[in-house]
Design a protein with these regions (language model features):
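Donor/substrate-binding cores of folate-linked one-carbon enzymes
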Residues: 22, 32, 81-200, 205
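Acyl-group handling in specialized metabolite and lipid biosynthesis
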Residues: 202-215
Length: 216
């Protein structure tokens, strides 16, 4: 199948690399715009863009997801599927409905728990012993689409987001390729999420890191 991949940080790299090793054709990648970082405000490419440069993959970096020029370029890639891992932007309906076989997201939790941008951090904060990866068809809501495949991953006693995320990312890449294999074979069985069991995992703010020294 013709795949457009959308992703930005280190967490997304194993998904892209798994696609590149698969039988599918990655026809293009969408990643966040280059941004200045650090004291020197040096422009830094996203980890996903670095892989694309190494592999010679066409890249789009739209400032606005509804930009007509961007949408036209995306259509010209003629994707069968858009695969998304930690892209960092909400996709508008014009993109969600573009590929004939749908948009598939790799999410860093066992949905419907921990919907949102910070599932790994919040699973650790809440003292979970198990988290995982869910692949799902994307819908207009925040991580509300039908689930496709799920795989549990143990949270070790000494895990931080920095140690847990790479393990989840590797599982995510493998699960994404398996999801696409089953999609092509017609053996996927999408499961609606139980909204009553849903919890949210918003992006952490600075104040979330404040230690309350009155707690023992």
């Amino acid at each position: 199948m013709r795949i457009v991949f959308m992703g930005t940080p280190d967490f997304a790299v194993p998904s892209l690399e798994a696609l590149l090793k698969s039988e599918h054709q990655v026809v293009g990648v969408v990643t966040q715009p280059d941004r200045p970082k650090g004291r020197g405000q040096e422009v830094v490419f996203s980890p996903v863009k670095v892989v694309c440069q190494r592999e010679g993959i066409p890249v789009l970096q739209p400032l606005k997801m509804k930009d007509p020029v961007f949408l036209d370029e995306l259509r010209q890639w003629r994707p069968d599927v858009i695969a998304v891992t930690a892209y960092g932007r909400i996709l508008p309906p014009a993109i969600l409905t573009l590929p004939p076989r749908g948009c598939i997201n790799v999410h860093g939790s066992l949905l419907p728990k921990y919907r949102g941008a910070g599932p790994i951090q919040w699973a650790i904060i809440r003292g979970e012993q198990v988290t995982g990866i869910t692949t799902m068809f994307m819908a207009e809501g925040m991580d509300t689409g039908d689930m496709l495949l799920r795989e549990a991953v143990e949270i070790r006693a000494d895990d931080t987001a920095g140690t847990l995320a790479p393990r989840l990312a590797e599982v995510g890449g493998r699960l994404l390729v398996e999801t696409l294999r089953r999609l092509e074979a017609g053996t996927l069985m999408p499961q609606p999420q139980d909204d009553a069991q849903a919890t949210m995992a918003p992006l952490l703010k600075k104040e979330d890191g404040v230690v309350n020294w009155t707690l023992s």
